[in-house]
From Swiss-Prot:
It holds the Pfam family Toxin_cobra-type. The record marks T44 as: Key residue for inhibition of muscle alpha-1-beta-1-delta-epsilon (CHRNA1-CHRNB1-CHRND-CHRNE) nAChR. The record marks Y67 as: Important residue for interaction with muscle alpha-1-beta-1-delta-epsilon (CHRNA1-CHRNB1-CHRND-CHRNE) and neuronal alpha-3-beta-2/CHRNA3-CHRNB2 nAChR. Expressed by the venom gland. This is Short neurotoxin OH-46. The record marks T45, F47 as: Important residue for inhibition of muscle alpha-1-beta-1-delta-epsilon (CHRNA1-CHRNB1-CHRND-CHRNE) nAChR. Keywords: Acetylcholine receptor inhibiting toxin, Disulfide bond, Ion channel impairing toxin, Neurotoxin, Postsynaptic neurotoxin, Secreted, Signal, Toxin. One of its GO terms (molecular function) is acetylcholine receptor inhibitor activity. It comes from Ophiophagus hannah.
């Protein structure tokens, strides 16, 4: 009985997802987010007139800007 209980405990510990982190797209490749970063974002901004820049990656909160979208699942900001 102790062996069965010990086996169950080991399987439970191994199967737990300890320290899940979000994965977001960047302009070039993927980014593993920090544990506190709960969202992926894609945002278009204009640093110079008539030159839009696409920003993608992890973020701590969802921006409320007009040309910004955020989501909270892996690779959702493609």
């Amino acid at each position: 009985m102790k062996n069965l209980l010990l086996t169950f405990l080991v399987v439970t510990i191994v199967c737990l997802d300890l320290g899940y982190t979000l994965i977001c797209h960047q302009v070039h490749g993927l980014q593993t987010c920090e544990p506190a970063q709960k969202f992926c974002q894609i945002r278009t901004t204009m640093f110079f007139p008539n030159h839009p820049v696409l920003l993608m990656g992890c973020t701590y909160n969802c921006p409320t800007e007009r040309y910004s979208v955020c989501c909270s699942t892996d690779k959702c900001n493609k």
